[in-house]
Amino acid sequence: MHELSLCESVIETIMDNVRTHHFSQVRRVRLTVGRFAGVETEALRFSFDVVARGTLVEGAELELLEEPGAAWCFDCSETVPLMDRLDPCPRCGGTRLHPTAGTDVMIKDLEVI
C-alpha cells in the first residue's frame, strides 16, 4: 500500500510549511491526484487520517481533485486526452503513447490558521 508512504511525504511537506510560516492549524488539504497515478482514493484517505494523527494536520478535511490523463502519441505526434492508460490514441488509434499528464500526486493548496 504505497498510499501510506505518499501520505507520509505529503504530511512531512505540509508540516515543513507549517513550521516555516508559523501556522497554528491546518483545516483543509487539497491534493491533485492524477488519473494514472495508481492511487486508491479510499486507501489514501485512510492513510491520511492515520499519518496526520498527533500533528497540526489532524482533523483537516482532505479534498481530492482528479487530474485528467493525457499522453503524447508517437504515431500522430499529438498530445491526446486518455481515460485509461492502456487506451489507444483517440485520434489515430495508435498504441505507442507516453503519458504527459495524470501521473502525479501534488499538494494543490492548504487552508490554514
UniProtKB/Swiss-Prot annotation:
Domain of life: Bacteria
GO terms, biological process: protein maturation; protein modification process
GO molecular function: nickel cation binding; zinc ion binding
Annotated Ni(2+) binding sites: H2
Transmembrane regions listed in the UniProt entry: none
Classification via Pfam families: HypA (PF01155)
Entry keywords, A to Z: Metal-binding, Nickel, Zinc
Binding site for Zn(2+): C73, C76, C89, C92
Sequence similarity: Belongs to the HypA/HybF family.
Purpose of the protein: Involved in the maturation of [NiFe] hydrogenases. Required for nickel insertion into the metal center of the hydrogenase.
Protein name: Hydrogenase maturation factor HypA
